[in-house]
Amino acid sequence: MSDETSNTTHFGFRTVPEGEKAGMVHGVFTRVASKYDIMNDLMSGGVHRLWKDAMMDWLAPRPGQKLLDVAGGTGDISFRFLKRAPGAEATVCDMTESMLVEGRQRADAAQMADRLDWVVGDAMALPFASNTFDVYTISFGIRNVTRVQDALNEAYRVLKPGGRLMVLEFSQLPNPMMQWAYDRYSFNVIPVMGQIVANDRDSYQYLVESIRKFPDQETFADMIRKAGFGLVKYRNLSLGIAALHSGWKI
């Protein structure tokens, strides 16, 4: 029996063979692709847009940079990056083709298609040469990866020396009472929204469970350091509902 089938990981609160998780996650995002952006607005009250703006503020894109936007889905991060960096280019890499289809349509509508590439790929085995990109971003995607450490190692590999990693992800609130209140909202409201808006309760149940399984801010920062990154820092957003993590390939 191979390691991939004998080892297990989590899919939300379920324990599944490692070899099955990627396909299960692919199924989730295939089902929610057409409603993904709408649901993000509903789930966060639009606050995810402010978090992404904060990501760009800290990232400070520069003209001519090459961005790799992993789990970039519908292109939200790439569009923001390109608007702030004339002459920059972005590659959106996602394992779910239907998410990329949504992104391409948005790029065409925004007349940005000539600055974007769209690639189907796995965050744990990126189809790019080493030392290729100036910036690597992943927004609300790394918690869905089967082996997070492998994805961080790949981020380090494809970045040029001096390149920067920036991760936006849901995190853990430091205040237990606030975490309790947020959990009540997440588990009782978001799956219902998923049923009403996307006719898919189960996918959104998985998404909220995956948030609770993701490491806290300090643990995740240590994982980034383990991949080889230096100057690792993080910033809490909305009191820790989400967090930005930054690291440099130095």
From Swiss-Prot:
**Which processes are annotated in GO (biological process)?**
aerobic respiration; menaquinone biosynthetic process; methylation
- Its domain of life reads Bacteria
- Spell out the molecular function terms from Gene Ontology: 2-methoxy-6-polyprenyl-1,4-benzoquinol methyltransferase activity; demethylmenaquinone methyltransferase activity
Top enzyme class of this protein? transferase
UniProt keyword Transcription regulation present: no
Residue positions annotated to bind S-adenosyl-L-methionine are: T74, D94, D122, A123, S139
Keyword Methyltransferase present in the record's keywords: the answer is: yes
Q: Which family does it belong to?
A: Belongs to the class I-like SAM-binding methyltransferase superfamily. MenG/UbiE family.
Put simply, this protein is called Ubiquinone/menaquinone biosynthesis C-methyltransferase UbiE
Origin species: Cereibacter sphaeroides (strain ATCC 17023 / DSM 158 / JCM 6121 / CCUG 31486 / LMG 2827 / NBRC 12203 / NCIMB 8253 / ATH 2.4.1.) (Rhodobacter sphaeroides)
In the UniProt record, the gene name given for this protein reads ubiE
